[in-house]
């Protein structure tokens, strides 16, 4: 292990890395169930998507482990699978095979961007204050995800102010989009699941503040045990034979390679009238994939040594390898039959637990692979156990805001929009877009447009085009 992952050089050991890997896996294992449920709405077989999710996650995460030697895990991105289902398939009318073809092309575009060093140029073009804001923004995003997953929030929606997209009258497969009338509020703490989440948060705070070794994982385990005794997790309801590996493999055969088949790439460019929509969808896929990854790497890169505290690149070779690993996951995932694979922001939970090398990623990859045989085991760990970890890690990441000069509005305004919009829009990419656009706007107002890097001007234009496509198509 020492020879492969250079543990001593990174100030870590096997026990810490394994603990970090377990922490990251349980923080993101929800994707094993959420992704198949979401993509199945397009007509894809859920059990096949379950295996495709694992294949994409394992491929990308193993690349992170052995090629990049970094503690990042990959899996199909949540925002990306929602865009795949509700926008590309439901709203734009493409088939799931064509949507998979778009995802594959997104991987190819990412390869070109990475090989030509464009991704590295993007990172280097971002001002130090914005990098700090991106780090803090990911903290806001993580904390919000944790608070929501713990069940601490409720949302009230006024009648006739929302739209429903989904499969006919089946509300279980519907997506509800509300206007600004949707108002968040605090739940009444009288639900066992919410109470367990609150207890889990207290346990996590205790272990982490006390500096107990392996406290993050211990918090997850203790809270899970409490959830079982509280009836939040019903072991008796778990059907260990419901989804056998044999039936999953059979369903995988229906979607594996569909992206490159006659109903995928073969049809995608057949109708010239649809080309504008195709190109804009691919652009949206690519922008989101690129900036979800870049945002995560910038947000956590200082701790693992790929982004220096000055905001400049410290080990560009490791950073490049992380970016290559990401695109490999997307390409293989698309061929297997899932939406874009991206570097997971939940990796921050494992990094917070001490993960510093690819051994953390290897543990995550192995656990994903094992999940193909024992998927019910993964479902035992409730959101109430993992959500508190996301909240605490988010709090710790907010410390990056101290690097922002709040007296200088040219720094403060973009930093505010970057960090806050990540949580409010539930998207790392949209937070970055808000920061980039407001940064450029402030510079123009101050007569300092020449200080804006050329790459940022290009990205501003691409973000604006993406927002226009969202409004038009």
Where are these regions (language model features)?
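Transmembrane alpha-helix interface/packing and boundary motifs in multi-pass membrane proteins
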Residues: 60-73, 205-211, 284-292, 326-336, ...
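Helix-loop-helix hairpins and the membrane-proximal interhelical loops
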Residues: 1-48, 220-319, 463-465
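Membrane-helix interface/capping residues of multi-pass secondary transporters
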Residues: 46-47, 72, 96, 428
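Loop-to-helix transition at the N-terminal end of transmembrane alpha-helices
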Residues: 43-62
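Membrane-embedded alpha-helical modules
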Residues: 92-222, 229, 360-473
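Helix-loop-helix junctions within the multi-pass membrane cores of secondary transporters/permeases
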Residues: 2-35, 56, 77-86, 90-138, ...
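Alpha-helical membrane-protein architecture signal
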Residues: 11, 15, 199, 279-283, ...
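Residue-level signature of catalytic and energy-coupling elements of molecular machines
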Residues: 18, 38, 122, 214, ...
